[in-house]
């Protein structure tokens, strides 16, 4: 099996070594498999970034799939769900930059941050932050 290129590079595995173990675990816990497009994962990650969590692309996949399963009614409003983020978005600065500057080919960012250019002075940065959030 040949893996396709993806923004979520750490899960870009064509023939995983532990595929049998993964299938056993899915069956044991009545799990399901779903996929996310590049646009879905980028927008889910960008949406999470707005909460203050700098989301990695792999967590973006999990969040995009969560949204799909909720919208299809597979996951109900009363259900309790945990999404584990195993990496910090700061390890994926290129991904974050591309998401928030609309630079991912074929993907329109719906949750991009507004860039603010500031002089490299503490007071200017502090004042800009104070204007954007309640302190």
Can you describe what each PLM-predicted range is?
Residues 95-97:
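Short amphipathic alpha-helical segments
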Residues 38-93:
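Claisen-condensing/thiolase-fold acyl-transfer catalytic domains that form or cleave C-C bonds
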Residues 1-55, 99-135:
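Active-site/ligand-binding loops adjacent to catalytic centers
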